[in-house]
Amino acid sequence: MRKKIVAGNWKMNTLPAEGVELAKEVAAGRKDVCDAVTMIVCPPFTHLYSVIETLKGANIAVGAQDCATEVKGAYTGEVSAEMIAALGCEYVILGHSERRQYYGETSETLNKKMARAYENNLKPIYCVGENLEEREAGRHFEVCKQQIEEVVFNLTEEQFESLVIAYEPVWAIGTGKTATAEQAEEIHAYIREVLRSKFGAKAEECPILYGGSCKPSNAGEIFSKENVDGGLIGGAALKAEDFLGIGKAF
């Protein structure tokens, strides 16, 4: 049985006090979401610690939104995987489309970040997906396959066991557009097929999250698909009621 996951990516939103308040609201409603669903929140670096402290004992994991390629040293402004892990983070988002688009992250960069994450026992949530131009050109399978082969295929079988994949239809993020449940299932099934070609039966255990515009009103339909194991949630994660509503959609 694959793990069911709802992960909230807060992006560059909330000030520390607001983040703590949001975490408290999510914690208060956690009891209404099935225990079998793994709930994760990923706040900005500035309030990772306070959110982790707030959520102690709440059965909600905390992740970071990124980590540095390097271990430590003269890298002004960077935050290392070791620092994140020392705070008590369990997960780290890597390869988000916004990092690829705005900060030029490449497979080379992401292989380094992936290595740092595993060195510090962080579980990566690795993002793949195509933009509108690539989708309209019919290249969505090709793009996702390349992003997996160039990074995920470098993992050992043991490392792969703790990996989470998030499929982001980049054309559906922040645009209000949503891939249909059928479109989501089609590409999730393909991603699992690609993983199977390298990792065999272990691919059946890898959670693949949908990272488009997911909300309580459409989550149930999307999550009902065989190869959709949850969601990497953006905007809806900033409202506790919506985030919890998505968690109840299984």
In which residue ranges do the predicted regions lie?
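Active-site loop-to-helix "anion-binding N-cap" substructures in soluble metabolic enzymes
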Residues: 1-250
